Amino acid sequence: MGPELLGRLVDTHAAALVLYARQWCAIPEDIVQEAFLKFATQRKPPEHPVAWLYCVVRNGAISAGRAAQRRHRHESRAAAQTPTWFVPAENAGLDAEIATRALQQLPLVQREVIVAHIWGGLTFEQIADLTGTSASTAHRWYVAGLSVLRERLGVICPSTPQN
């Protein structure tokens, strides 16, 4: 596998892969970088490189998210056993944009399919392979998620005439 293919994949898919990984972990850039490193060390390139990258990113992000949750639980237990030194600020959280919040409020399966299809450019067949479902189920999740997003964001989709 040549550096041209790797460079082209990074240029065209890295941003969407970061967005995809962000669903599960707080370090999506690291996960995507690790996925590209794994891709570069493959003796034989996968048949569908983009779908392969999404699979590796998904697995890595889920693992990183789980590790972060375990670390957070451990740190919370340790912090609960010591007296607090500071009063927490009431406005510690950052307000995200409305669309980002709406997307984050979707069920994970719907959010995953929407991000993979819109920003990742994956087909519903590739998404089905990635999520272990059928293409029709992936499409149903996509349509349902878009419907919820439209409702929450107040976006009206023009209807098509029925014959």
Task: Give names to the regions the model predicted.
Residues 30-37, 47-59:
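Structural recognition of an alpha-helix C-terminal capping motif at a helix-to-coil junction
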Residues 104, 108, 120-140:
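Helix-turn-helix DNA-binding module
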